[in-house]
């Protein structure tokens, strides 16, 4: 029997037995079985704590629960997304990811890069949101989204100030939020610092809808809704991040290929048709063509005019090649343009501008528009 001694409280303190127990416990902890036992216990505790409590454990000291501390640096590895096709009788299901574009910081509230007019309507025929999917969807009459998720991926330093918000609006004809109060009242909305990645799951409703390959009076019949990205509170106009859309969609009812060319016209008998790649505004001295999304475009413009003077780009648009000729009461211009961000534009200047006809389609830079 091990020797023991009595303390002032008449309690027994096991000396030799305590030392022996400590040695045995240490041996168990250092053994493979002991290490596995300990880690299993830790994982069990973490599972019981729940997700929010686990976040509290790994966040920086002094950071309140639910907050995110700014790291020295972070990044996201973006890898190629290969579309997945699943075929069934009369339909095809596609899962893919696409890039909507790059966005810049701003001091005041700027929504969708400053481009208005329900830019990001969720319809597979909308080339601004689905530049890759649109070419496939043009061969079908109906669609149904099974999953839609927005992902904001930062590309700025953690010293960048401001806020970035992404949102979903079920009514695709609502105007964009005009201030922070309207933005904060969105039913589906998430917001973070520019350097913080964020995601938003868009609710889907298992409803079959028609493609919007022509002029539709009520867009609520053809669109799932609209999405948007807003920036504010920044101290610069630096690029802050990219917006991606992840989706799973089922296409129904194959049809002859719909037009991938947009036609815009003015004057009596005008018949706009096709996709919605640009917006056009014109007066007696200028015609401005604004690109709703990034990409390379081929434009063919004919317009009545007394004279034509210059062609100017703005907002990140670049002329790759062009030919513009003036003869008599009209001028004609064909141009290959790259728009780097939503809202890039090209302006035609002259005198006594009148009716116009414009054709727009997506292209490659190698589609040279120069007259040789």
Curated annotation (Swiss-Prot):
Keywords: Capsid protein, T=3 icosahedral capsid protein, Virion. GO terms for molecular function: structural molecule activity. Its main location: virion. Transmembrane segments: none annotated. Pfam families: Viral_coat. It comes from the Viruses. Capsid protein self-assembles to form an icosahedral capsid with a T=3 symmetry, about 32-35 nm in diameter, and consisting of 180 capsid proteins. Belongs to the icosahedral plant coat protein family. This is Capsid protein.
């Amino acid at each position: 029997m091990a020797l023991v001694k009595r303390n002032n409280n008449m309690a027994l303190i096991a000396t030799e037995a305590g030392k022996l127990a400590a040695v045995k416990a240490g041996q168990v902890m250092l053994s493979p079985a002991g290490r596995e036992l300990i880690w299993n216990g830790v994982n069990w505790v973490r599972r019981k704590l729940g997700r929010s409590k686990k976040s509290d454990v790994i966040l920086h000291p002094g950071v309140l629960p639910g907050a995110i501390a700014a790291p020295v640096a972070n990044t996201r590895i973006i890898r190629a997304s290969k579309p997945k096709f699943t075929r069934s009788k009369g339909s095809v299901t596609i899962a893919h990811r696409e890039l909507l574009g790059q966005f810049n910081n701003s001091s005041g509230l700027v929504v969708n890069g400053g481009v208005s007019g329900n830019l990001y309507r969720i319809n597979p025929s909308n080339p601004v949101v689905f530049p890759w999917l649109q070419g496939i969807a043009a061969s079908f009459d109906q669609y149904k989204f099974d999953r839609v998720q927005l992902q904001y991926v930062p590309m700025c330093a953690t010293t960048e100030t401001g806020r970035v918000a992404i949102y979903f609006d079920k009514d695709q004809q609502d105007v964009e939020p005009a201030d922070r109060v309207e933005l904060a009242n969105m039913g589906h909305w998430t917001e973070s610092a520019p350097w913080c990645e964020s995601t938003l799951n868009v609710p889907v409703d298992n409803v079959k809808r028609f493609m919007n390959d022509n002029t539709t009076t009520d867009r609520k019949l053809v669109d799932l809704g609209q999405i948007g990205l807003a920036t504010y509170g920044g101290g610069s106009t630096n690029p802050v991040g990219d917006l991606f859309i992840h989706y799973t969609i089922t296409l129904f009812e194959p049809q002859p290929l719909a037009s991938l060319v947009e036609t815009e016209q003015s004057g009596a008998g005008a018949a706009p048709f096709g996709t919605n790649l640009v917006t056009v505004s014109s007066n007696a001295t200028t015609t401005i063509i604004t690109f709703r999304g990034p990409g390379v475009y081929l434009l063919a413009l004919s317009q009545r005019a007394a004279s034509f003077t210059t062609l100017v780009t703005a907002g990140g648009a670049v002329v790759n090649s062009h030919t513009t000729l003036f003869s008599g009461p009209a001028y004609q211009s064909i141009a290959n343009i790259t728009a780097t961000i939503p809202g890039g534009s090209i302006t035609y200047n002259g005198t006594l501008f009148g009716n116009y006809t414009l054709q727009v389609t997506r292209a490659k830079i190698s589609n040279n528009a120069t007259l040789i």
